[in-house]
Amino acid sequence: EYEHMPAVRQEDETFTRQLEEVNYMAAQIKSLIQRFQLVRTDETVTFEELLVRVGEGQTPYADRQKMIIDALKRRETMGSQFFPDFSFALLHARTAGVARPVFTVFKPETGKQFLSPDMKGIRAAIIMLMPEEEHVNENASMLGYLSQKLVEEDEFLNTIMTGEEEDIRGLLSRYLKKYFNRYLDKI
């Protein structure tokens, strides 16, 4: 009977770790949905000004704001994430400026396009930020899933363009529920 103890203990530890992983993912998803924001801003905002507003919207601390702005600028130098043909920009980065994943949408107050030349053709700037921490793969997978939905599901982009905050939050919740169910199936 004694020889079976280590296997049982290992199984318990594996299950405990799985529970911790599920709990972590559930908390990240809940936070992302609750903290989602639709921010209406001046249609004349430039790319630089938008980045400042993104930073200010995430944290009151100037050093963290700078981390967010720098991370988004760095990511943009790797290749533009502006898609004027689809009227949106996808600005995403990993940064120590945030403690949890972020999904925020900036749109002009007018509901039309941004007017600044460096924002030409853009009706919505979608911001996705993830923290620099040990759960990089989990957060990247979740935000990657949302990026995929932007491309695959016309309803998602249409709702971002024309909907209100609660409409977008509702879709986020629906998509992340599907993501979470898939996540549970893999564990």
Sequence positions of predicted segments:
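Cytosolic covalent-transfer regions centered on His/Cys nucleophiles
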Residues: 1-187
